[in-house]
């Protein structure tokens, strides 16, 4: 393949070799080859339709690009750093193959709008994949919720025992979070799904192009409305990376819980051996490497977002070479999010729940204390007074090595004469859980209804 610069007419000296290597992006943007070829074929078809280039050339261009696609997919295409990027590598090879017709492909187009198109096409496909992986994770969560209906565990605030909840309720909390993550991805897709091709370098083109025709070929519902904006901004990539950062934050929180729950101190869950590793020195160890790595990779995704925000923060309109730095953080974010979601969906689907340990933990720490306060309120006591009474009751229990169910009726009535025999029915774990039956609560029937609602909407 010739390494002559396609933009070299103005220059009298060759590019310094290190400058070529420093400015080239082919090592990472070659993953855009399919989108670049698809966009070029659509552009050529439009040029032919508009009579800007002969239809005979369109046929040669299309056939040549399809052959290049097969060569790349078959590992037979040699990429050149001297040709800088995926666009120039493909165009140079095309011209080498088909001659003069290949040189007409770039009519009415700039690399500025070409790369904006390629990234949108690529990211559009990747968002669909990310959404599919989110669906798999939600399926795993729902499956665990259904298999473990009725399993009671402690709910926490400040990582201190707060109130008993259903394990299924906890799983469905993550279903809500990851469902919103999918919604953010869909919102991002809706805003980015516009065609930038036709914006030219920055001001449009003097040729009578038909942008709407290209949009139809490439399945874009509309075209961008300002040529400067079309090539200047990467907010669509930033929006995806911001949504990905929130998604990874949710995965990281879940990871932290699984790490804690799998310790010998909690023993709430057992992660499958296939998702854990051992120690090189301690033979007893079973380390939760997968959730630990996902937790760690969350910072990587945050860093990618900040990197691109920093690149874009002071750029004058329109295109600047700084924007070449958009791809590596974007691609890394895509790869990290997809990998994390896939492995998490599989891991959650295979984890085993230690129901006895969860229940035993829920029975400790005065988890039904709020139920006693609510009981007194229903007996006519103001809530703040009830709170005070129960606080003193808990202090008494701590001093005497007792828990709430251990108290006799006489001991209860020493704190309030409003307390009767019915107090004992209010402080069981099942009673506490099922009393919270308002929409969004942890009551068994409410959780069942939420599972059914989510499944019906999928």
Swiss-Prot record:
Q: Does the keyword Cytoplasm apply?
A: yes
Determine if Metal-binding is one of this entry's keywords.
no
- Where in the cell? Cytoplasm
GO terms (BP aspect): arginine biosynthetic process via ornithine; L-arginine biosynthetic process
* Pfam families membership: ASL_C2, Lyase_1
> Which EC number(s) does UniProt give?
4.3.2.1
Q: Organism's domain of life?
A: Bacteria
Q: Which GO terms describe its cellular component?
A: cytosol
- Report the CDD domains cross-referenced here: Argininosuccinate_lyase (cd01359)
Task: Give one GO term, molecular function aspect.
Answer: argininosuccinate lyase activity
What reaction does this catalyse? 2-(N(omega)-L-arginino)succinate = fumarate + L-arginine
InterPro entries attached here? Arg_succ_lyase_C, Argininosuccinate_lyase, Fumarase/histidase_N, Fumarate_lyase_CS, Fumarate_lyase_fam, Fumarate_lyase_N, L-Aspartase-like
PROSITE patterns reported for this sequence: FUMARATE_LYASES (PS00163)
Swiss-Prot/TrEMBL keywords: Amino-acid biosynthesis, Arginine biosynthesis, Cytoplasm, Lyase
UniProt pathway annotation: Amino-acid biosynthesis; L-arginine biosynthesis; L-arginine from L-ornithine and carbamoyl phosphate: step 3/3
- What family is it from? Belongs to the lyase 1 family. Argininosuccinate lyase subfamily.
* Protein name in the entry: Argininosuccinate lyase
- Organism expressing this protein natively: Geobacter metallireducens (strain ATCC 53774 / DSM 7210 / GS-15)
């Amino acid at each position: 393949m010739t390494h002559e610069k396609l933009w070299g007419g103005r220059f009298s000296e060759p590019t310094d070799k290190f400058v070529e290597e420093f400015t080239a992006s082919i090592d990472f943007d070659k993953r855009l080859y399919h989108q670049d070829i698809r966009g070029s074929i659509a552009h050529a078809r439009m040029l032919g339709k508009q009579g800007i280039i002969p239809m005979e050339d369109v046929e040669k261009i299309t056939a040549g690009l399809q052959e290049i696609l097969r060569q790349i997919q078959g590992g037979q295409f040699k990429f050149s750093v001297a040709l800088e990027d995926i666009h120039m590598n493909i165009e140079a090879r095309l011209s080498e193959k088909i001659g003069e017709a290949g040189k007409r492909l770039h009519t009415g187009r700039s690399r500025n709008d070409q790369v904006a198109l390629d990234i949108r096409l690529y990211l559009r496909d990747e968002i669909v994949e990310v959404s599919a992986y989110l669906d798999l994770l939600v399926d795993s969560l729902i499956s665990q919720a259904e298999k473990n209906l009725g399993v009671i565990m402690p709910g926490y605030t400040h990582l201190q025992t707060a109130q008993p909840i259903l394990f299924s309720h906890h799983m469905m909390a993550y279903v809500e979070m990851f469902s919103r993550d999918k919604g953010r991805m869909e919102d991002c897709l809706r805003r980015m799904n516009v065609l930038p091709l036709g914006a030219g370098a920055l001001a449009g083109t003097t040729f009578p192009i038909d942008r709407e025709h290209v949009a139809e070929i490439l399945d874009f519902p509309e075209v961008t409305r300002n040529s400067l904006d079309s090539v200047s901004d990467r907010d669509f990539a930033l929006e995806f990376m911001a949504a990905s950062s929130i998604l990874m934050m949710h995965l990281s929180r879940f990871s932290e819980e699984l790490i804690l729950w799998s310790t010998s101190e909690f023993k709430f869950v057992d992660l499958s051996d296939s998702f854990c590793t051992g120690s090189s020195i301690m033979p007893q160890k079973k380390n939760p490497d997968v959730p630990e790595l996902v937790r760690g990779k969350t910072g990587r995704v945050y860093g990618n977002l900040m990197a691109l925000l920093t690149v874009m923060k002071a750029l004058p309109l329109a295109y600047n070479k700084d924007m070449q730095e958009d791809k590596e953080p974007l691609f890394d974010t895509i790869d990290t999010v997809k990998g994390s979601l896939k492995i998490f969906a599989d891991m959650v689907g295979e984890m085993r729940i230690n129901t006895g340990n969860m229940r035993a933990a829920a029975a400790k720490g005065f988890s039904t204390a709020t139920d006693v306060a609510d009981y007194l309120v229903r007996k006519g006591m103001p809530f703040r007074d009830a709170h005070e009474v129960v606080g003193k009751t808990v202090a008494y229990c701590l001093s005497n090595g007792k828990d709430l169910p251990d108290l006799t009726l006489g001991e209860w009535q020493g704190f309030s004469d409003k307390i009767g025999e019915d107090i004992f029915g209010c402080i069981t774990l099942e009673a506490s859980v099922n009393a919270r039956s308002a929409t969004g609560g942890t009551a068994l029937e409410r959780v069942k209804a939420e599972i059914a609602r989510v499944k019906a909407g999928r």
